[in-house]
Amino acid sequence: MRFKRVRLRAPAHLLADLRDFYDGIDTGETELEFAASEGEPFYHFAFLAPWERFDELAAGEEVFDFPDWDARAFYFHDPAGNIVEVVAHRGLEDPTGLSELGLVGDTRAMAAELEKLGLELWDGTFEEGRLAFMGERGRTLILAPASRGWMPTGRPSERHPVEAELSGPPAGAVELEGGLYRIVRS
């Protein structure tokens, strides 16, 4: 599974700032878009980085180690306040594009729908307050219950519209959380 296109929402007055900000970041194979929205939506998502370049990219940042995943990451905020992660997984082939995208809601119900697209739970659990990871190591939809704190800030997760197109079989589409999220696989 790979993220081909992701469309998120942001306040209209920040769209130009976001375009300028992400124009300077290599988003690899993923097309990242922002559309105007009411309110102040925010998301958690992560970009892949090559393992060999991680220390260079993370210079001056607080680094978090994930030994169970053989991964390292650092975090920052973009102009809209999104919690953005840069993560490197040792041994991951072709580490480009988006690595993670957080979806907030009923984790068990979302997982049941995502299984129709061939995505499997590869880590985590559906226990109350816990995260579930669908997809594969390095290319993951993170299912989070509402109000669970995102790393590293602890900021409570919120539900905001997401449209995502994933590559790889089987082809199909699902809508989650009453149509708030639309996930297409082609």
Regions found by a protein language model. Name each.
Residues A59-K116:
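Surface-exposed beta-loop interaction hotspot
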Residues R19-D26, P50-A58, V87-R90:
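Short, intrinsically disordered, charge-balanced linker/junction segments flanking boundaries
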Residues M1-E33, W69-A71, D106-T140, A146-S147:
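Core segments of cupin and vicinal oxygen chelate
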Residues K4-A12, A36-A59, R72-H77, G97-D106, ...:
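Vicinal oxygen chelate
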